[in-house]
Amino acid sequence: MARDTDTARSIAKNRRARHDYEILEEFEAGIVLRGSEVKSLRAGQASIQEAYVLVRDDHAELVGATIPEYAQAGPYLNHVPDRPRRLLLKAREIDSLRRRVTEKGITVVPLELLFRGHLVKLVIGLAKGKKLHDKRRTEREREDRREMRRAMGRRG
């Protein structure tokens, strides 16, 4: 029986990222985890709200993400909840990220943590910070689209 790797089940989303940043490009990265971390994620416990991605010479790390200790694991088998976790990306993706991050105003933010089949993946975005007027414009455009949908719904 083939594994179903197309289905994705979301664990945690970083909703502020799309509000505070303009996402230029998205990447899907694997993440190096311990067993108790995976068990905790299967229970739906994780937070990437305060997390960010550091791009080093030859690898990328997720820093600041919190995966709470797994309650059923003993004290010796558990993990540190907010340790840095290595991201699994192709060498050319890491090179691309490293080059782009050196540009002014460009950063890498985690967008979503999810299960794809039995694997844990992290969707990261190459992002540029929004100014206050950009946030207002985005909000106005979203409101306009909502109003148009409402008007079209009443008409037909």
Task: For every predicted segment, state its role.
Residues D4-D20, P84-T102:
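A short, contiguous, amphipathic alpha-helix enriched in charged residues
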Residues G35, V55-D57, G64, I124-K128:
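Flexible glycine-/small-residue-rich
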Residues Y70-Q72, K121, L132-D134:
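Switch/connector loops and helix/strand junctions flanking conserved nucleotide-binding motifs
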Residues A2-T5, I11-A12, A60, R155-G156:
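Short, surface-exposed linear motifs at loops/turns and structural transition points
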Residues S10-V55, H59:
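A positional/architectural concept
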Residues L54-L97:
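Helix-adjacent hinge/juxtasegments
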